[in-house]
C-alpha cells in the first residue's frame, strides 16, 4: 500500500458536496436543475428548474424510473413505490411531463411549508413552546386547524403578529400596501 493505508476520504468543497443528489446541479443564481441522458442517445431530457435540490432530485428519479425501469438507482427509492412500471416504451415528452409534474409538486409543497414557517417562526416569537409544537406537527405531516385559525384571527385583528414586521421577508402577494396603510 503506497498510500499509507488511507481510504478515500471526501474532501470538503469537492463535487460530491455541490451535488447532493444524482442527476441535478445548481445554477450560479441558486436554482437547482435536473436533466438526464436518454439511453443509447447523445441527447438529454430537460427535467426543469427547481428551488430545492429535493424537488430536482425527485424529478430525476421519476424520469430515470421510466427510462431504465425498477432496477434504476434512485435518490429516493422509498418514495416511488406506488408507481407502476410497464415494459412499453414511453416517449421522451411523456417522461418529461411526468417528471416535471412530480418536481413541481415537491417544489410547491416545499415552498408552502417554507412560507408558513417564515410566517409563524419569523413573526410570532412570544411562545417557544407553540413554535416547537407547530414544527413537530409539520414533521408529522399535519397541522392543527385551531393553530391556523388563531394566527389568522391575530393577523386580522391587528394582534402582536403585525407589530413585529420582518423587513427581510418579502410581503405576501395576497396583501397590498394599500391594505396596510388603511389599517394604520
From Swiss-Prot:
GO terms for cellular component: nucleus. Its main location: nucleus. Residues 20-77 bind DNA. GO terms for molecular function: DNA-binding transcription factor activity; transcription cis-regulatory region binding. Residues 123-184 are annotated as: Disordered. It comes from the Eukaryota. Keywords: Activator, DNA-binding, Ethylene signaling pathway, Nucleus, Transcription, Transcription regulation. It is found in: Nucleus. Residues 174-184 have a biased composition (Acidic residues). One of its GO terms (biological process) is ethylene-activated signaling pathway. Residues 161-172 have a biased composition (Basic and acidic residues). PROSITE patterns: AP2_ERF. The keyword Glycoprotein does not apply. InterPro entries: AP2/ERF_dom, AP2/ERF_dom_sf, DNA-bd_dom_sf. The keyword Transcription applies. Belongs to the AP2/ERF transcription factor family. ERF subfamily. This is Ethylene-responsive transcription factor ERF010. It comes from Arabidopsis thaliana. The gene is ERF010.
